[in-house]
């Protein structure tokens, strides 16, 4: 008799996705981040749901409702810090996942890659509106500064900003709608994740060599399920260590001051995972130019498959491309550091050089070096 998991309409879907899925035998731990992102998403939705039960999206009570969660709700402090640090873990996994895709040429699965870029944008939007909810100083001023960027759009900019605000400044209407967005977006993300997996399972996984591995596949379960469990345990270990020992390590002290429209913080900056884009935004003296550079710094990912000039898919056997890849990582870390610094000498010029290098590496140097590698291999 055929096993029920292969015949039942619902279990068949799960079976084909997580149990009998043919998987390359040589995929490394860099392939763990997809499942870790799924774990992060589930954690964020669950902790977020419990936080939403006690939170009030109103300017007069939002800050005190978060304080109430931390002080009076059973393990409320734990749920709140799990949610805040869970967002950081989410972005660490997200950036590692994208980095893996860039290094091993996974972007050649174009539909999967494009849905992935869309997912990145949606997660970024969710994190941004979520940061506004505690209604601390950095929440308020972060929302004001970032939404104000839309006023750089010619002709309709100001109207657009006021439409998003629901008034003439960030106020009650803004907080209420941001809470609504923050609640609905994770479910949209979940739907996109399913589409992302659907497209991935059309082609099958890539592997470190970038060479088709149809002749060497193993079932996903038990091999990769156990490998994923190890990754999950490490993720949980890091998240719990962060949450229980240094819950405020990645946060901003300014957010422990209630929002005050009459007092601007000395240094307005977003959470660490947006700092690289914030540095690129600040490095251009023109407002519209800065906004375009900010958008392009993320949307450039869409153009990566078109910039593939190498005859090889993966960077595994391309030392020059590897050098440029790690230069790009170092550049992004530099931009992240610059984004956290005040706008003064020497940070301004370092930020501008790092921003130029970021676009230069992706648009010019990497495609050129790939062509040189082809020539060296006489391809």
Swiss-Prot record:
GO MF annotation: an example: ubiquinol-cytochrome-c reductase activity
Binding site for a ubiquinone: 201
Additional information: Heme 1 (or BL or b562) is low-potential and absorbs at about 562 nm, and heme 2 (or BH or b566) is high-potential and absorbs at about 566 nm.
InterPro entries hit by this protein: Cyt_b/b6_C, Cyt_b/b6_C_sf, Cyt_b/b6_N, Cytb/b6-like_sf, Cytochrome_b, Cytochrome_b_C_euk/bac, Cytochrome_b_N_euk/bac, Di-haem_cyt_TM
PANTHER family in UniProt: CYTOCHROME B (PTHR19271:SF16)
Organism: Orcaella brevirostris
Function noted in UniProt: Component of the ubiquinol-cytochrome c reductase complex (complex III or cytochrome b-c1 complex) that is part of the mitochondrial respiratory chain. The b-c1 complex mediates electron transfer from ubiquinol to cytochrome c. Contributes to the generation of a proton gradient across the mitochondrial membrane that is then used for ATP synthesis.
GO cellular component, one term: mitochondrial inner membrane
Record's keyword annotation contains DNA repair: no
Bound cofactor: record note: Binds 2 heme b groups non-covalently.
TM segment ranges: 33-53, 77-98, 113-133, 178-198, 226-246, 288-308, 320-340, 347-367
Pfam families (alphabetical): Cytochrom_B_C, Cytochrome_B
Family: Belongs to the cytochrome b family.
Annotated SUPFAM superfamilies: a domain/subunit of cytochrome bc1 complex (Ubiquinol-cytochrome c reductase) (SSF81648), Transmembrane di-heme cytochromes (SSF81342)
Quaternary structure, from the entry: The cytochrome bc1 complex contains 11 subunits: 3 respiratory subunits (MT-CYB, CYC1 and UQCRFS1), 2 core proteins (UQCRC1 and UQCRC2) and 6 low-molecular weight proteins (UQCRH/QCR6, UQCRB/QCR7, UQCRQ/QCR8, UQCR10/QCR9, UQCR11/QCR10 and a cleavage product of UQCRFS1). This cytochrome bc1 complex then forms a dimer.
Protein name from the UniProt record: Cytochrome b
């Amino acid at each position: 008799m055929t096993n029920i998991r292969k015949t039942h309409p619902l279990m068949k879907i799960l079976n084909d996705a997580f149990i009998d899925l043919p998987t390359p035998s040589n995929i490394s731990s860099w392939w763990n981040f997809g499942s870790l992102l799924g774990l992060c998403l589930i954690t964020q939705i669950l902790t977020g749901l419990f936080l939403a039960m006690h939170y009030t999206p109103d300017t007069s009570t939002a800050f005190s409702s978060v304080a109430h969660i931390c002080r009076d709700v059973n393990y409320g402090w734990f749920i709140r810090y799990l949610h805040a640090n869970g967002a950081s873990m989410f972005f660490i996994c997200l950036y590692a996942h994208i980095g893996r895709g860039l290094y091993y040429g996974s972007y050649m699965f174009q539909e999967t890659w494009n849905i992935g870029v869309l997912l990145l944008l949606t997660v970024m939007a969710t994190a941004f509106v979520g940061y506004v909810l505690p209604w601390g100083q950095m929440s308020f001023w972060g929302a004001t500064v970032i939404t104000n960027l839309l006023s750089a759009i010619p002709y309709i900019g100001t109207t657009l900003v006021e439409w998003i605000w629901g008034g003439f400044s960030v106020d009650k209407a803004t907080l209420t709608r941001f809470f609504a967005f923050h609640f609905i977006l994770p479910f949209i993300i979940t739907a996109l994740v399913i589409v992302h997996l659907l497209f991935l399972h059309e082609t099958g996984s890539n592997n470190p060599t970038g060479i088709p591995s149809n002749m060497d596949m193993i079932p996903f379960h038990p091999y990769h399920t156990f490998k994923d469990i190890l990754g999950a345990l490490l993720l949980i270990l890091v998240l719990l260590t962060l949450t229980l020992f240094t819950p405020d390590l990645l946060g901003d002290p300014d957010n422990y001051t209630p929002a005050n429209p009459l007092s601007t913080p000395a240094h307005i900056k977003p959470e660490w995972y947006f700092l690289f884009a914030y540095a690129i935004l600040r490095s251009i003296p023109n407002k519209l130019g800065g906004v375009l550079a900010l958008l392009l710094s993320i949307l450039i990912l869409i153009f990566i498959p078109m910039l593939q000039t190498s005859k090889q898919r993966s960077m595994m056997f391309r030392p020059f491309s590897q050098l440029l890849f790690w230069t790009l990582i170092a550049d992004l870390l530099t931009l992240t550091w610059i984004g956290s610094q005040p706008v003064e000498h020497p940070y301004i010029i370092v930020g501008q050089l790092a921003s130029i290098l970021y676009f230069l590496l992706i648009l010019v140097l990497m495609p050129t070096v790939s062509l040189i590698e082809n020539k060296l291999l006489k391809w």
